[in-house]
Amino acid sequence: ALCAVDNTFATPYLQRPLEHGADIVSQSLTKYLGGHSDTIGGALIVDDEELDERLGFYQNSVGATPGPFDAFLVLRGTKTLPVRMDRHCENAMELAEWLQGHDAVDRVYYPGLESHPDHELAAEQMDDFGGMLSFELDGTLDEASTVVSETEVFTLAESLGGVESLIEQPAAMTHAAIPREERIAAGLTDGLIRVSVGIEHVDDMKTDLAAAFDAALS
């Protein structure tokens, strides 16, 4: 059996699964590696010549090759990857700590917080904790919908990994087709909100979310 790891959230800058025994690492080039929400692509990374040949044969057979301009955009994005990821991580940690202390929030999911069940594991294998977080609003499905609709710094969208901050509500967007009982059982509550923390000033993000919370819950 082969072990494959999706390293999109972490990027090679923060985590390198091949060093931890993975056979295949998948990376969405659309997200942090491109970094500017203007290209589409993906990559598989291996450290085995035979496996590389097998994957290369399949890639050529199905025509899964990027266009030249898409490749240029990804290569351009890699030049600023370290400085962008440092800012994503810094902002995400500060925002997670702020959310954790906010009365409108029940729970925050971010591996950089000591309250996260996998914090120690993440600290062992990652150089930092990334720019993705989610939190559970102390409110209903409609109130969570109001929050994601009222933000101005955060753009309502399902993607992630660009320089701009994005916000989305899984229960009403990415997982809307799943019956509520199944969704709740899987941990996707009505008030769950996912955030891709961008590189804007973190104080602007806090002000934006605070105003959205007030609009939804007051």
Features from the language model and the residues they span:
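PLP-dependent enzyme catalytic core of the Aspartate aminotransferase-like
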Residues: 149, 165-218
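Conserved small-domain helix->loop->beta segment predominantly found in fold-type I
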Residues: 93-152, 158-161, 179-184
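Short, solvent-exposed beta-strand edge segments and adjacent coil->beta transition regions
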Residues: 39-41, 128-132, 190-194
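Short, flexible turn/loop "capping" segments at secondary-structure junctions
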Residues: 35-36, 66-68, 125-128, 185-190
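A common structural junction motif
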Residues: 62-63, 151-159, 212-218
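Short, well-ordered beta-strand elements within core beta-sheets of diverse protein domains
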Residues: 73-83, 131-138, 194-198
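Active-site beta-loop-alpha junctions enriched in small/polar residues
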Residues: 8-10, 14, 113, 138, ...
